[in-house]
Amino acid sequence: MKKHLNLLREFSVPLVAGVVVALFWANLDPAGYRAFDSTPFWGSLSFHFISNELFMTLFFGIAAVEITQSCMPGGDLNPISRAVNPLFGTLGGVLGPVLVYLGLNALVGLPELRNGWGIPTATDIALAWLAARMVFGPGHPAVSYLLLLAVADDAIGLAIIALFYPDPNHPVVAAWLLLTLLGMLVAWGLGRRRVRSYWPYILLGGSLSWIGLHQAHLHPALALVFIIPFLPHRLRESRHLFDDDPGDRSPLAQFEHEWKVVVDFGLFLFGLANAGVEFSSIGTVTWLVLVSLLVGKTVGIFGFGLLAERLGFRRPRGMKRRDLLVAGVVAGTGFTVALFVSGSAFSDPVIQAAAKMGAMFSLAAALIGMLLGQLLRIRKVH
């Protein structure tokens, strides 16, 4: 039974199942799907809110664990100078899609679509990370490279939303970020006192961080990203972040061990809540978003990764140039933040729906990455 469950997790079956169910439901009964997804059932709580703002907090927390471990001595991104290359890739992965989008839009001559330039800037952490694990194997340094790139990418995406797509009804209230800072200080203090359970870090520091981001009108799902690095951890002998270490009983390892399975299967909820887009919505902006993600991300990440090398910032150990190219392709998977920006960039519901279709179609980047990985004979590392 455990073997079968691990197989489902390995091939991201829960997430794929959620996406498929949402697509069928939204196209067969769009009104019913929208009512299920967005209708509050207790106060302001809806299925969409629970999935995106509460459950995804755990997902980003697990992602933060992987980044923390990869930055430890012996990790794929240690010494920290090795993180400079993926951060360069992040910059290229933002600028590339923006330039491609604006360039293509200038060619088609539709000024009403110009405001969508921010849609293809972010990489979907959940889907890109899972696709990378399938392409490279969970122990490949390209996975932690792409994970760091995707997290930084989404941080830039959220900044773009706050700066360029403000909601007049819910403007950013920066003062509330002091509460997130307080949460970080609480987590730091718990670490100084050598608290050996992860629960106080999550319940105290995590709650403060979540409330601060929520009240600031930013994405509260990123709350644990600011808390996880403060959890006490043990240095691992293995340099691969996905290697299991049964002797590691540190708070960081316990959090990962106890919540990773929950997150892997809970991604069904994420797919169900976000993938309900009608196929009849396809329009010009669909292709602008899709091409910007597929081409802009690949060229930008690969080009800026090579530029970082020229400047003396090497890739992680064991990561070849062909791995960087494939990682750039996989990073073209735009989803969550792209869907969110689509709703902020356009007020016209027809254009908005078409833009969301482009974000949905970018799931093809994961498939293209897998095929390219086979063609380039990428060796999986488990």
UniProtKB/Swiss-Prot annotation:
Reactions mediated catalytically: Na(+)(in) + 2 H(+)(out) = Na(+)(out) + 2 H(+)(in)
One MF term in the entry's GO annotations: sodium:proton antiporter activity
Location of this chain's protein in the cell: Cell inner membrane
The UniProt record lists the keyword Kinase: no
Domain of life: Bacteria
GO terms of biological process kind: regulation of pH
Record's GO cellular component terms: plasma membrane
Keywords: Antiport, Cell inner membrane, Cell membrane, Ion transport, Membrane, Sodium, Sodium transport, Transmembrane, Transmembrane helix, Transport
UniProt signal peptide: none
Record-annotated membrane-spanning stretches: 11-31, 45-65, 91-111, 116-136, 145-165, 171-191, 197-214, 287-307, 324-344, 353-373
Gene3D superfamilies: Na+/H+ antiporter like domain
Membrane-topology descriptor: Multi-pass membrane protein
KW Kinase (keyword) present: no
Database matches in HAMAP family: NhaA (MF_01844)
Family under the similarity heading: Belongs to the NhaA Na(+)/H(+) (TC 2.A.33) antiporter family.
Function: Na(+)/H(+) antiporter that extrudes sodium in exchange for external protons.
Name assigned to this protein: Na(+)/H(+) antiporter NhaA 2
Phylogenetic placement of the source organism: Bacteria, Pseudomonadati, Thermodesulfobacteriota, Desulfuromonadia, Desulfuromonadales
